[in-house]
């Protein structure tokens, strides 16, 4: 099963305080592979971004040596001004769960 963390959620807002974009960052690995995983970004249940968790994260490589160091993700996604909740999900490989939620954050 994939696992990991949603470490950062930064909301950029318009002059009237509505969200316009969100930066998400964190990491994810799956014990069934050393390859980077795909990360889905959903807002109010709708897919708004699909990124690879392939950025350098030496801390993850040291903590989980079997995984290697390149399992970070960092992306900015556009969101609708009426957006409420952002969730990040990792896609797994091999046996186990195909998707695991890494975290959610209210962005309204």
Language model segments and positions:
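Basic, ligand-binding patches in group-transfer machinery
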Residues: 1-108
């Amino acid at each position: 099963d994939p696992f990991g963390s949603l470490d950062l959620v930064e909301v950029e807002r318009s002059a009237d305080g509505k969200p316009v974009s969100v930066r998400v960052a964190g990491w994810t690995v799956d014990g069934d592979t050393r390859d980077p995983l795909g990360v889905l970004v959903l807002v109010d249940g709708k897919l708004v971004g699909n990124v690879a968790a392939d950025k350098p994260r030496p801390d993850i490589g040291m903590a989980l040596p079997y995984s290697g160091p390149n399992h970070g993700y960092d992306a900015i996604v556009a969101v609708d001004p009426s957006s409420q909740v952002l969730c990040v999900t990792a896609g797994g490989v091999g046996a186990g769960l195909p998707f695991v939620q890494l975290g959610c954050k209210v962005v309204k």
